[in-house]
């Protein structure tokens, strides 16, 4: 909540989790702005999410950089998660955040959220590869995303309708993504995310589908999975 909390307050709020993650030897703490977001509001269209100007995001990035350095000094890298419905949603938002922040702040690169937000997955990956510390492999169903946008529906409507799905079940080329990660010697986590209605998409079946697809594309990219 860095838009509404000052530096000291925000550090106080996240300190317990940061310390816990250090104790657990976690790869990073994933951070996203949870104030001024519409992602949890069923009646608010995702198209109505708050938007900041370039200068406003640069100012925000400076503040986030201080928090990221505070985390780093405690032994925990901080990776920023761009998210639908929030102030950092589309490709411009991500570019401005990265341009305006210090190297203390890394990026949690989420394929599904970026494409849903209208961004270019490969261009963003190639541009900010050296800042990516954590990766979310999430696919989307473009027809559902199109319906959500055109009919002014909410982010939660999108989740329930099945806008997101596991890798290999949507439209994102995860072979190309994996090839780029391998080329940049990425060695962090790849997390599968695909929040959707379990009545329509049985969790075990879809988890298995996503896992098998990731194993296949990573093997072809010579990206080892440990």
What do the predicted segments below correspond to?
Residues 1-11, 51-54, 113, 163-169:
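The substrate-binding groove and active-site-proximal loops of carbohydrate-active enzymes
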Residues 1-5, 34-36, 83-85, 110-114, ...:
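Active-site beta-loop-alpha junctions enriched in small/polar residues
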Residues 75, 85, 110-112, 168-170, ...:
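Glycine-centered flexibility sites
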Residues 25, 65, 69, 91-105, ...:
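Histidine-acidic metal/acid-base catalytic patches
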Residues 6-106:
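Active-site acidic/histidine proton-transfer and metal-coordination neighborhood
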Residues 43, 47-50, 77-80, 111, ...:
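A near-ubiquitous, low-amplitude feature marking generic local secondary-structure context
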């Amino acid at each position: 909540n860095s838009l509404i909390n000052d530096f000291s307050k925000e550090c106080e709020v996240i300190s317990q989790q940061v310390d816990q993650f250090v104790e657990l030897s976690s790869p990073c703490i994933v951070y996203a702005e949870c104030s001024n977001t519409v992602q949890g509001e069923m009646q608010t269209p995702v198209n109505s999410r708050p938007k900041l100007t370039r200068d406003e995001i640069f100012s925000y990035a400076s503040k986030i950089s201080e928090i990221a350095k505070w985390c780093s000094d405690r032994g925990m890298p901080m990776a920023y998660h761009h998210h639908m419905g929030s102030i950092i949603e589309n490709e411009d938002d991500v570019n401005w955040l990265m341009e305006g922040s210090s190297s203390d702040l890394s990026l949690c690169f989420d394929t599904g959220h970026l494409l849903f937000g209208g961004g270019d997955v490969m261009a963003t990956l190639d541009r900010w590869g050296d800042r990516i510390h954590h990766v979310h492999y999430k696919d989307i169903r473009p027809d559902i995303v199109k319906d959500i946008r055109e009919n002014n529906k909410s982010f939660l409507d999108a989740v329930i309708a099945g806008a997101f799905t596991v890798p290999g079940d949507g439209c994102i080329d995860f072979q190309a993504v994996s090839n780029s990660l391998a080329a940049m010697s990425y060695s962090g986590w790849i997390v599968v995310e695909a929040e959707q209605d379990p009545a329509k998409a049985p969790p075990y079946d879809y988890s298995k589908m996503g896992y098998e697809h990731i194993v296949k594309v990573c093997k072809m990219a010579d990206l080892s999975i440990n």
